[in-house]
């Protein structure tokens, strides 16, 4: 934990010189990259496609959307990796560290097998947990030195990357580890890798675009909602959305070969449940959204953008509060109020122009009542149902206990180290504020994990039309599964 606190302080010092100018006033919007430059490098002969959490083997329906199409030249292979994350993928699933460790072995073997073919070159497509695995593989290749593949033989396309240097959830809280969950905050994807890399992030994706200032509780909640409503949508993107991606700025003198892109999200994910309310849901959401946008975006440092506008290649941990002038916030809220009222009024006018239709109500017939009584459950069915409810409640309770244990045992030590480090540096405000910010941010993540602890069968990575096979295992969640040997497609 001392190392974690020291890492935090070092990272804060590294970006301190750029933070002042970028937060004092709203930053200029980065310009969209030219379509021909997305991705900024040609695909290699073979593309290895790795699925997100919950989808260990991507089905054919996942292999056609716009981002994927831009990373394929000749051969495309979906590769199996565990992609489990206790408790999000079930109470008997693998913990993150074990799943990542197994996936890293498979990814490394797959790359080396493909590159053993003379003249072959590989593009790795990673999404969510497989983006973590790809990031760790970059670190591994760096450690291999001359034995690693050459830069011309390998490149990466990553989406929904939890290790984004300046937005990923696993980089916001440096070197934090939750032993009770066997979950490591791995840090940042290497920005100095020799392998050309393109990283795409959807705005408000809570895993890949987490709030920079977690004391902003509303921004944290919006990011957590984005795990469900945004992180799952990468394969639903249209070509126009991908081509309109905004290339994020990198630090002066940056000579790396990684490009970072943000794709804007139209609606705040925190309002998606309200929009699901019939008739009045959308008008109310449109009334609230402009001002909510200002509040949420302040969690990233600028009321105009739902992502950090500072350098994308610099590992940026959480901070205390953005240095945005109060007048800028007041003006943005005033404009948001006016915009919300106009949108709400327009929605009501559109509703009033639609013909009013009332549902037809049919009273039950005597025969229907008799049939309902006959279909009533038997005592045995009632007992079995109660047993299933008890079993289900136990399954729900177990992750809650594990998460609570992780926070109770680890968070106090982490925040204490932050307090001591900042106090030793003579910064009393940060000594009090940083532990509080960490507690608010991690507590909100905890609440979100409980809410999405049992994702649909389609997987946490994607919940719409692309459904992958469910990975079944009889292994305990801390036990490493049998090693899967990668075999190239013939």
What are these regions (language model features)?
Residues 1-490:
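A glycine-centric feature that highlights glycine-enriched low-complexity/repetitive segments
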